[in-house]
Amino acid sequence: MTQIQIRMPTSTKPKVIDLFCGAGGFTLASWQAGFECVAGFDASEVLTSRFSENFPKTTFVKCDLQSAQVSDILRGTGLKAREIDGIIGGPPCQGFSWIGRREANDPRNTLIHHFFRLVRSIVPRFFVMENVPGLLHQPFSSRLKRELDQLPQQYSLLGPLPLDSADFGAATRRQRILIIGIDSRYVDSVAKEDIAKHYVRTIPTVREAIHDLPEPISSTSQNSDGWAGYSAEPFHGERGSYVKKARRIPPMHLGSVLSREFLSKGLVSGFQKTQHAPEIVRRFKSVAEGGTEPISRFPRLQWDEQCPTLRAGTGPENGSYQSVRPIHPSRDRVITIREAARLQGFPDWFLFHSTKWHSFRMIGNSVNPQMAREVLSAIRSRL
């Protein structure tokens, strides 16, 4: 565990910690739902590289949660265990995933155990864990049941609950499961119907999510984050609401000074250009909306549908595989970092890694912030 500078909690909001925080999708959702996320914990330097810029009021603690003790967690928060209202987190899930082979002995599978180990030790008023649907299948489902059976009896459990981020207003289809635990001594339980109240009436489309974004640019040492100006104004009325929300300048407890300043000038990051060889461009050109390029297996997005699940790829410790990136609906190129972030539900002030590879890992590994925000809002209304 590295030496840290603790940002002491300053508000009266319920306080949560984010385990396996990564880029901070759950952290973002917790702030937006009315919580104070006092600390995020993760072992990855790359996936958390912009965490402190995006969340200036949240302490980031680089640590291996497989070996972390409760004392390490409390030291990182500046709180006593009884002062932590909630624990949220999405332990890495590649070992459970249907994409590629599911590996029963993948060491990442034990991270769920450590999430629940810390929940059992800290005993927060509630917890929320997000993961992939593959966790519901053997042998992983038996392991999950053992973890849940060991929780203190006062927890009222909801889940594993299958959810799709599109139902909560994201422009991408992303199926995940959530497990919610509520300490019935302090908080009224949350039912599936309470979560369903947060479903949107109309699911946003790719067009509604990215219609105002510019073409990619060649990044330079002076502009490694790919800042560029918007290419259009948001649609009028309800069809423009997705973009208008994404463009909002954040409150002072969120976002960096740089992103706030640039956003106020109409500039947004994430437009680093991917250089495609002429042969690749020719292959992309032959793919209709909704089709798949037969060699790369890259799908072309459809303007008036949702984006399929955005994948993360892997880090160097697991082969450095780059994820399949969708082709833009009408341009013969893959989507940019910002287009992916928009589809996944991240606001425009949110910064990612300066490289496309790691940025797509950050986005693909993240809890969908819109889904998480609505689930946490349902819990917040009970506190």
Residue ranges and their predicted role:
Residues 233-383:
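C-terminal target-recognition/interaction regions appended to catalytic cores
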Residues 4-123, 133-137, 141-143, 152:
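Core alpha/beta nucleotide-donor-binding catalytic domains of modification enzymes
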Residues 2-10, 72-81, 98-289, 368-376:
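Class I S-adenosyl-L-methionine
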Residues 91-94, 184-185, 315:
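Short glycine-rich anion-binding loops that position phosphate/pyrophosphate groups of nucleotides
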Residues 23, 141, 176, 365-369, ...:
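Short alpha-helical patches at coil-to-helix transitions and adjacent helical residues
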Residues 89, 129, 311-312:
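Redox-cofactor binding/interface segments in oxidoreductases and associated redox assembly factors
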